[in-house]
Amino acid sequence: MRNPIKILVHAEMLTLEGICQYHIGLDDDECKFATLQDLFKTISMSQSIIYCNSVKRVADLTEAMVLKGHPACCIHSGMDKDARDDAYVNFKAGKYRVLISSDVTARGIDIQQVSTVINFDLPRSVHTYLHRIGRSGRWGRKGTGISFVTRRDMKQLRDIEVFYSTTICELPSTFKSD
């Protein structure tokens, strides 16, 4: 090669323009489902994705949401491809307003109507945080990312803030979405 140039790429940077990020501080995991129910009662959301850290947690939360009357479906790595594709197509078409997922959908899905992403479980990796929250606010629209944070999760939240040079404020009680 003649006259090669060297291109330096910075570490992954937070490129979440238009996405408001918040956390909700909770005492422990047992508070999460009740908090999620309260959130759905008080905040208007067109479509939302809720992320959990395990297949069992996704399945259990989906069952609980459906029992509470929420039009919800799930996608996780324990499902075969046809079942995942069916859930994705139905969610994208608007048959379901809530998609509950493991990190299998944190990259690569692009649904314009998703306005809110909820980290029911804070991701284990700072890199995954960006990909999860980035599912909202697509196509130039505004989006919201809300993370449930227990006392045990506070260090991970601080690690995310440091890594992305950002502050993730507590969700204000006056918050309205959509």
For the regions a protein language model found, what residue spans apply to each?
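Conserved helicase RecA-like core
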Residues: 1-178
